Design a protein with these regions (language model features):
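Helix-turn-helix DNA-binding elements, focusing on the entry/boundary residues of the two helices
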Residues: 25, 36, 47, 62-65
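Short alpha-helical DNA-recognition segment
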Residues: 33-52
């Protein structure tokens, strides 16, 4: 892309990814009636980790995303892809 450095492009993509995961995790957790503490307990992670993910301050590892998807009974892609709106 002309005019933008690779570093700027990567930073923008990373920020968008963190925002998507944050939004999806909040939505899925709420839909299933879990508190941050309960989700963290079941997934074997710290509650602060859930909070940091949901606030977009932490990019979870693949292992953490997998644990969350198992507990939330969803596909991994449900956590990392923006929800599509129906037309």
């Amino acid at each position: 892309m002309k005019g933008k450095s690779l570093t700027a492009q990567l930073k923008k993509a990373s920020s968008a990814s963190a925002s998507t995961v944050a939004d999806r995790l909040v939505t899925l957790r709420s839909e299933r009636g879990f508190s941050q503490a309960r989700l963290a307990e079941l997934a074997g992670v710290d509650r602060k980790t859930i909070n940091r993910i949901e606030n977009g301050h932490f990019s979870p590892s693949l292992d953490t995303l997998t644990r969350l998807s198992v507990v939330l009974k969803c596909r991994l892609s449900d956590l990392v892809e923006a929800k599509r709106t129906k037309r």
